[in-house]
């Protein structure tokens, strides 16, 4: 094998396998924070106390796992609850409790990342082994930084209680009842919209099928018309050929008759006795 080809083959063999690109479902549509908040299993408001490296596992698998140890792609976080869990949540822990949130890091379609000593709003869920994981509803963000805008949004959507000193969120909840009504409507409205979109999609598929059949019928009609035109053309051509043939036959018969008249025998002269 030539040296350049050998080097190229060695380079390809030594290079890591390409990572799988992010592939969302074909029917995926983005959801608002409010709708995702309603669908999230639990919402907590907590401060990150410490970060701990985490080995690759079921919830943080990546094709390039051999880099995880070097780059620190996966980690867990020790967090402290700044308020009781959000109203309606299934996690019954009071403010000041410390929890371990696993499954953080960088993934193919999204990232769950936090910084130590900062506070966040978390969408979390619990697995069958009672591990707390980020709940990335609809393959979207599950962690929100502690900003005034997010405080206003989440304190309006959910009722936090018994917050730590200086972390009261109820100051933004004057429109909570209105937001709660909107929150309860969110899933039903989204479901109705999705059903309507699915119905429209099915109708579009039916229309596309009918249009395809219509095009096929048009092609068949065109072929029949072309065949009919060709048949008429052939018929006219045969008529002309037949007419010319009849004319030739008529002319030939007339010529034969004239020739026959010209060849009548001469009568012998009459002799008197």
Curated annotation (Swiss-Prot):
Subcellular localization, as worded in the UniProt entry: Secreted
Keyword Cell inner membrane: no
Domain of life: Eukaryota
Major location category of this protein: secreted
Summary of the tissues where the protein is detected: Expressed in aorta and adipose tissue. Enriched in mature adipocytes. Over-expressed in adipose tissue from either hormonally-induced or nutritionally-regulated obese mice models.
Modification after translation, per record: N-glycosylated.
One of the GO BP terms on file: negative regulation of tumor necrosis factor-mediated signaling pathway
UniProt keyword Ribosomal protein present: no
Keywords recorded for this protein, A-Z: Coiled coil, Glycoprotein, Secreted, Signal
Signal peptide residues on this chain, from the entry's feature table: 1-21
One Gene Ontology CC term in the entry: extracellular region
Recorded phenotype for the gene knockout or disruption: Mice exhibit a lean phenotype with reduced fat mass and smaller adipocyte size compared to wild type mice. Adipose tissue exhibit decreased levels of lipogenic genes, such as fatty-acid synthase (FASN), acetyl-CoA carboxylase (ACACA) and diacylglycerol O-acyltransferase-2 (DGAT2). Mice exhibit strongly inhibited age-related hepatic steatosis and decreased number of inflammatory cells in epididymal adipose tissue.
Coiled coil: 188-250
Sites where a glycan is attached: 100
General function of this protein: Negatively regulates TNF-alpha-induced pro-inflammatory response in endothelial cells (ECs) via inhibition of TNF-alpha-induced NF-kappaB activation in ECs. Positively regulates lipid accumulation in adipose cells.
Quaternary context: Homodimer.
Protein name: Coiled-coil domain-containing protein 3
UniProt source species: Mus musculus (Mouse)
Gene: Ccdc3
């Amino acid at each position: 094998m030539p040296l350049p080809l050998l080097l190229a083959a060695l380079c390809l063999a030594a290079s890591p396998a390409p990572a799988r690109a992010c592939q969302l479902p074909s029917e995926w549509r983005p959801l608002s924070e409010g709708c995702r908040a309603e669908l999230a299993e639990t919402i907590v408001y907590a401060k990150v106390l410490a970060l701990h490296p985490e080995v690759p596992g079921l919830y943080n698998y990546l094709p390039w796992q051999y880099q995880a140890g070097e780059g620190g792609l996966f980690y867990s976080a020790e967090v402290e609850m700044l308020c009781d869990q959000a109203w309606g949540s299934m996690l019954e822990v009071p403010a000041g409790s410390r929890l371990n949130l696993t499954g953080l890091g960088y993934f193919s379609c999204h990232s769950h990342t936090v910084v130590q000593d900062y506070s966040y709003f978390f969408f979390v869920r619990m697995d069958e082994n009672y591990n707390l994981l980020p709940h990335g509803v609809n393959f979207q963000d599950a962690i929100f930084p502690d900003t005034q805008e997010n405080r206003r949004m989440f304190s309006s959507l959910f009722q936090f209680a018994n917050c730590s000193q200086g972390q009261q969120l109820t100051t933004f909840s004057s429109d909570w009842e209105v937001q709660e009504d909107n929150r309860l409507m969110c899933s039903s409205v989204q479901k109705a919209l999705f059903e309507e979109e699915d119905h429209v999609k099915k109708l579009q598929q039916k229309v596309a099928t009918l249009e395809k059949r219509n095009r096929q019928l048009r092609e068949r009609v065109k072929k029949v018309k072309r065949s009919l035109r060709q048949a008429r053309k052939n018929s006219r051509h045969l008529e002309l050929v037949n007419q010319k043939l009849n004319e030739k036959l008529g002319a030939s018969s007339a010529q034969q008759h004239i020739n026959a008249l010209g060849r009548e025998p001469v009568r012998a002269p009459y002799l008197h006795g």
